[in-house]
UniProtKB/Swiss-Prot annotation:
Record domain tr-type G: where: 55-235
Top-level taxon of the source organism: Eukaryota
CDD domains listed in its UniProt record: EF4_II, EF4_III, LepA, lepA_C
Gene3D superfamilies membership: 3.30.70.240, Elongation factor 4, C-terminal domain, Elongation Factor G (Translational Gtpase), domain 3, P-loop containing nucleotide triphosphate hydrolases, Translation factors
Higher taxonomy: Eukaryota, Fungi, Dikarya, Ascomycota, Saccharomycotina
Chain residues that bind GTP: 64-71, 128-132, 182-185
GO molecular function, one term: GTPase activity
EC number assigned by the record: 3.6.5.-
Subcellular location: Mitochondrion inner membrane
PANTHER family: TRANSLATION FACTOR GUF1, MITOCHONDRIAL, TRANSLATION FACTOR GUF1-RELATED
Descriptive protein name: Translation factor GUF1, mitochondrial
The species this protein was found in: Yarrowia lipolytica (strain CLIB 122 / E 150)
Membrane topology: Peripheral membrane protein
Assigned keywords, A-Z: GTP-binding, Hydrolase, Membrane, Mitochondrion, Mitochondrion inner membrane, Nucleotide-binding, Protein biosynthesis, Transit peptide
Length: 656
């Protein structure tokens, strides 16, 4: 039975137009692949693409919340167009191991597809974008290369927070949105609810909403005809001067830095001399091509196409995503919307036990070549030695980077607690008329409030606008959580009779301290979260320092709101005590703000039995030995140093 079942399933994927037999627990679907297109490669593929006019180009992406089936749907579309073999590697466009393990998309990927519709060839460019808020800048750049998007909604979960956020981002860029309800094969699928939410939340008509199952392939063949008929083609012009948008970049051992670009206008080919509008640097184009699904070299890239360019760049610092490439001596205007990505979370990275500094530096540089959004500067800690201060787009971004460091390079590191960029506003001095604003991303640089109190006008912390969707029965617990994290309610709307959309303004510092985990606990896993930057707000900030025998352990210092300091101080000293070894003198652990001690724990000294070999009747010798031991302990208490092992830092930081 099972052998026959597997054979019938394989047959359904291989096509062309083979239907799976009707079985009691299988949906019936067909996957039609044009064998002529599936067999194309090399010069034949390039000639076929060259014959397609720009009017028959369609560039589109998929808008969805995390885990709503975006990568699986991409697989089905690639199989449908013959780009990849049916039943092959899952989540094909998720290239990184960490993406497949976590089931998320981290790096935007693109793939070119050929599709025959009503007897004519169409050139389709699919951009698979991340769904998580940490990668919002990458999503925005990817949308800029598209004319429309599939608005994907999970039938079992309905509209979620990141669905809403990504919808409004796509809507603001004037993308045509096609609603698609996925996972309709699940027993818990609630299609009417999803329909109602699409209509009420996004004000989109539900007459032509596609209902599909990306997992089984059910109705997936209806998607591309709808894309062709409803999403407009690019409006670029071949005869206009070259303008190409840099969407992403990665490093290749042979070509150097490779750019993923969207050619807005004009034509670019090997030998074309281009200039970066942002940096002013000039380059000769070494190679151009498309992703089908891997790199396929072509003679040229034309207006409306998404492909790669190799310019001979040696460092990723030369490639600025969102920048415009134009021909040398051209007067073409740059494409709008360029903005450098700004890190929002900073951590200290130091070599772990047995890790060589030079080897770790090489590993970090290799990873940052493929991730332009990561910033890296050298830093020194008295406790941990030489290391780096690194900036990330968010806590997930930092966590993914750490996983890649371990998986791809076997590098074990110590990562300090995340910090956000605070601002110190100083009063004008002398002839100055405006306050001086200093941004601080390292707690070690936080000013001494006792010494500089007169100079400081205010301390400010970054804020975020949070959007949460949750079942109505959890409103009370989630609102209590937001208020406990210094949140301010902005809005509350009902998506339908059971789902609520909450909007709060919350300090970013509270968000990076496992707010998402607490939100899941408060809603029993049913809530979803999205956020975006929302300026700065004046706040009562302090730096909490950890001291061991009077010496500040700089790697553990954190900036926080004054209301959190006492509770955090007590937790810190109790936890850190469990990671330190005993000594022959008292080890005093303190948490303090300035000179004010908020909490203290003591690891009592262990005594050596100096009387072990002494005769019981020798009282004078006994007294002398005890006196000498006491004097020695007093000297150790004064001059002795506590060497904190790196395992203690790793253990403590992993639990804070």
């Amino acid at each position: 039975m099972w052998k026959g079942l597997l054979q019938s399933t394989r047959a359904a994927w291989r096509g062309p137009c083979v239907r799976a037999p009707r079985l009691p627990f299988f949906r019936r679907y067909s996957l039609c692949v044009d064998p002529e297109i599936a067999a194309l490669s090399g010069p034949e593929l390039e000639a076929r693409i060259a014959a397609i006019p720009i009017e028959r180009y369609r560039n589109f992406s998929i808008v969805a919340h995390v885990d709503h089936g975006k990568s699986t749907l991409s697989d089905r579309l690639l199989e449908l167009t013959g780009v990849i073999a049916a039943g092959g590697q899952k989540q094909f466009l998720d290239k990184l191991d960490v993406e497949r393990e976590r089931g998320i998309t981290v790096k935007a990927q693109t793939c070119t597809m050929l599709y025959k519709h009503k007897g004519e060839d169409y050139l389709l460019h699919l951009v698979d974008t991340p769904g998580h808020v940490d990668f919002r800048a990458e999503v925005s750049r990817s949308y800029a290369s598209c004319g429309g998007a599939l608005l994907l909604v999970d039938a079992s979960q309905g509209v979620q927070a990141q669905t809403v956020a990504n919808f409004f981002l796509a809507f603001s860029l004037n993308l045509t949105l096609l609603p698609v309800i996925n996972k309709i094969d699940l027993e818990v699928a609630d299609i009417p609810r999803s329909m109602d939410q699409i209509e009420s939340t996004f004000e989109l008509p539900t007459d032509n909403v596609l209902q599909v199952s990306a997992k089984t392939g059910l109705n997936v063949d209806q998607i591309l005809p709808n894309v062709i008929e409803n999403i407009p083609g690019p409006d670029g012009k071949l005869e206009d001067p070259l303008r190409a948008l840099i969407v992403d970049s990665w490093y290749d051992n042979y070509l150097g830095v490779v750019l993923l670009t969207y050619v807005r206008d004009g034509v670019v080919s090997r030998g074309t001399k281009v200039i970066s509008h942002h940096t002013g640097r000039k380059y000769d184009v070494k190679e151009v091509g498309i992703m089908y699904p891997g790199s396929v070299k072509t003679k040229e890239l034309k207006a409306g196409q998404v492909g790669y360019m190799a310019l001979g760049m040696k460092s990723s610092s030369e490639a600025h995503t969102g920048d415009t490439l134009i021909k040398v001596n051209s007067n073409a205007e740059p494409l709008p919307g360029f903005a450098e990505t700004k890190p929002m979370v900073f951590v200290g990275v130091f070599p772990g036990e047995g890790m060589d500094f030079a080897d770790l530096e090489e590993s970090l540089q290799h990873l940052t070549l493929n991730d332009r959004s990561v910033t890296m500067t050298k830093a020194t800690s008295q406790a941990l030695g030489q290391g780096w201060r690194m900036g990330f787009l968010g806590t997930l971004h930092a966590s993914v980077f750490e996983d890649r460091l371990l998986q791809e390079h076997g590098a074990h590191v110590i990562i300090t607690a995340p910090s956000v960029p605070y601002r110190v506003v100083y009063h004008p001095r002398g002839k100055e008329t405006e306050p001086t604003i200093v941004e601080i991303d390292n707690p070690a640089n936080f000013p001494d409030l006792q010494l500089e109190k007169a100079r400081i006008q205010s301390l400010e912390e970054p804020m975020v606008a949070c959007t949460m969707t949750l079942p109505q029965e959890y409103i009370g617990s989630v609102m209590s959580l937001c208020e406990a994290n210094r949140g301010e309610q902005v809005d509350m709307n009902y998506l339908n009779q059971t789902q609520v959309l909450l909007k709060y303004r919350i300090p970013l510092n509270q968000l990076v301290e496992d707010f998402f985990g607490k939100l899941k606990a408060a809603s029993q896993g049913f809530a979803s979260l999205d956020y975006e930057e929302d300026g700065y707000m004046a706040s009562k900030l302090v730096r909490l320092d950890m001291c061991v025998n009077g010496e500040v352990v700089d790697a553990l210092s954190q900036v926080m709101h004054v209301s959190q300091a006492e509770t955090r101080a007590r937790d810190w000293v109790e936890k850190f005590k469990t990671f330190l070894r005993w000594h022959q003198f008292d080890v005093i652990i303190q948490a303090k703000i300035g000179n004010k001690i908020l909490a203290r724990e003591t690891i009592k000294a262990r005594k050596k039995d100096v009387l072990a070999k002494l005769h019981a009747a020798d009282l004078s010798r006994k007294a002398k030995l005890l006196k000498n031991q006491k004097a020695g302990k007093n000297r150790l208490q004064t001059a002795g140093r506590v060497n904190i092992p790196k395992e203690a830092f790793s253990g403590f930081l992993s639990k804070t």
